[in-house]
């Protein structure tokens, strides 16, 4: 094996780094190529990491459907939804932006 492609987020990159260091120690000539992909969208210098746009879309659709269900049942319940994002709030921000621009079902989010 001369090349290894690693596609993933923080954990995958860290594992690739450890693998690279171990391969260097034993003198194995192999190149590791990291392809960043994360729903957290927390990769430095990258505006939209692969994985984030589809996760944001799924989050907006899911919350819109939940809001529709709440309107259907006509209750005064309050719904809390927690989304992924590690130490960032990009998915929550995407859902909030969609709700405020009419792309969602007119929901309000506290971010």
Annotated model-derived regions:
Residues 13, 38-42:
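Short gly/pro/ser/thr-enriched loop/turn and capping motifs at secondary-structure boundaries
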Residues 6-8, 14-18, 22-29, 33, ...:
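Accessory alpha-helical/coil subdomains and C-terminal extensions
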